[in-house]
Amino acid sequence: EIQKNIQSMEQASNEIGAQIQAIQAQQAAAAAAAAAANQGSGGAGYNGAYVPANGVLTFPVPSYYGVTSEYGWRGDPFSGGQSFHMGIDLGASMGAPVLAAGDGRIILQEYHWSYGNYVVIDHGNGLSTVYAHMSAFTKPFGSVVKAGEQIGAIGTTGASTGPHLHFEVRVNGQHTQPRGYLGM
């Protein structure tokens, strides 16, 4: 039973990664088609090429009180076994603002049994960020957002042990250690 729960959570993360890759591929194809059609006619909005200043993203929870769970192997709080934690958990008060870590577009916004209420922002160049367990969304799906703009509120939805933000950085849909991207 424990191993089954761990495998189910890992499968959920892999499914989200595959969704991110598929959406990014669709967006790249649409952008290429639009660029070919417009041939440099300009325009406003998100250009799909966000590069954080000095390689550091905006911290998504300014009022956090600490990292409550690290990226990597850990004792799973639900199964009691070992599982790989695909992001970092930033403890904060219920309802505290969750901010976009960089300029981009909200490409996923839904409820998942494990991630709870979660958002994925595509920052372009294969970089995306995941914000999970939120109590509320403050921007609609498809919104273009700027770094530091509020996208949600701290919560404890899904498989959560208390109010926090589960934050992931994904490169081409694959999870990676987020600390370096946050300047931690």
Task: Please give the residue ranges for each predicted region.
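Catalytic cores of peptidoglycan-degrading enzymes
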Residues: Y50-M184
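Alpha-helical oligomerization segments with coiled-coil/rod-like character
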Residues: E1-Y50
